[in-house]
């Protein structure tokens, strides 16, 4: 058997196969109702939606900003990767920050950092390369909230399970993934439409008005979206000290009693 055949054999045989009994399967309609009843879960999804809307929407048009507004082709690749580079550097300290101030406050801090830095880039001397490096490095600090969305979603699911005895992890994460893709698609289209509304088209001469539209789409609009994403975080209320510890203790105790009852 060749290496390729072994690879596919391992891939096929090592897949986890879970068979869900018909009586244990929930209805999609009921699952959606449960999600709509879970305020904190909805807030987490909206936060992730706006975060992806601003971040990935900007990525789709940022290259035009560096080409036509900054007008420096030498550093385009670095500028495009700056957020990821800074995010990789600060990732080791992220858990300590989250542990100290909590997921919600870390997410709010991240949105503020990203929103403020992009608006400063919008109004500032963006043709100055040193200025761009500093602002984009600050913008990259927004990566401190990387795991916060998933953590808050799990907390919301656990809290709902504790209160109502029902959890729908699968549907919640499926909707979250879909919402992220929808946000990316809408943002990409919307920001390009804004550029087109200011007269941008391939091969046209760059006028100050067109550059203004590119700057608006690449910096101001994503910055505003990040600020809007703070609103659902202000409504989210599962970050009270010790609250989730109590929730998990009750869930663990309930599951323990359930297992003991089943073993009898």
Please give the residue ranges for each predicted region:
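A membrane-interface helix-boundary motif in multi-pass transporters
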Residues: 4, 193-224
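Intracellular loop-helix junctions on the cytosolic face of multi-pass helical membrane proteins
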Residues: 4-63, 67-73, 214-217, 222-264
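Juxtamembrane helix-start elements in MFS-like secondary transporters
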Residues: 72-80
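Helix-to-loop junctions at the C-terminal end of transmembrane segments
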Residues: 89-103
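Cytoplasmic membrane-interface "Motif A"-like loop-to-helix N-cap segments
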Residues: 99-111, 163-167
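C-terminal ends and interior cores of transmembrane alpha-helices
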Residues: 113-127, 132
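Hydrophobic core of transmembrane alpha-helices in multi-pass small-molecule transporters
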Residues: 129-147, 152
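A late C-terminal transmembrane helix in Major Facilitator Superfamily
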Residues: 166-198
């Amino acid at each position: 058997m060749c290496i390729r055949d072994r690879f596919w054999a391992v891939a096929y045989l090592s897949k986890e196969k879970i068979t869900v009994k018909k009586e244990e399967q929930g209805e999609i309609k009921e699952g959606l109702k449960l999600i709509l009843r879970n305020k904190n879960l909805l807030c987490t999804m909206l936060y992730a939606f706006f975060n992806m809307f601003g971040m990935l929407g900007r990525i789709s048009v940022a290259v035009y900003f560096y080409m036509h507004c900054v007008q420096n082709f030498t550093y385009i690749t670095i500028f495009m990767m700056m957020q990821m580079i800074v995010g990789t550097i600060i990732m080791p300290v992220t858990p300590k920050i989250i542990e100290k101030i909590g997921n919600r406050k870390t997410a709010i801090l991240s949105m503020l950092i990203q929103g403020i830095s992009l608006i400063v880039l919008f109004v500032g001397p963006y043709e100055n390369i040193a200025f761009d490096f500093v602002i984009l490095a600050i913008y990259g600090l927004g990566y401190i909230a990387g795991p916060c969305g998933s953590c808050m979603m799990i907390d919301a699911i656990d809290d709902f399970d504790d209160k109502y005895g029902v959890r729908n992890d699968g549907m919640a994460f499926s909707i979250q993934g879909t919402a992220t893709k929808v946000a990316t698609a809408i943002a990409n289209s919307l920001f390009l439409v804004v550029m087109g509304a200011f007269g941008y088209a391939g091969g046209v001469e760059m006028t100050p008005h067109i550059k203004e539209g590119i700057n608006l789409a690449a910096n101001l609009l994503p910055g505003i979206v990040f600020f809007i994403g703070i609103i659902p975080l202000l409504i989210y209320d599962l970050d009270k000290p010790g609250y989730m510890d109590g929730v998990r203790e009750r869930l663990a105790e309930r599951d323990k009693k359930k297992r003991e009852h089943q073993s009898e």
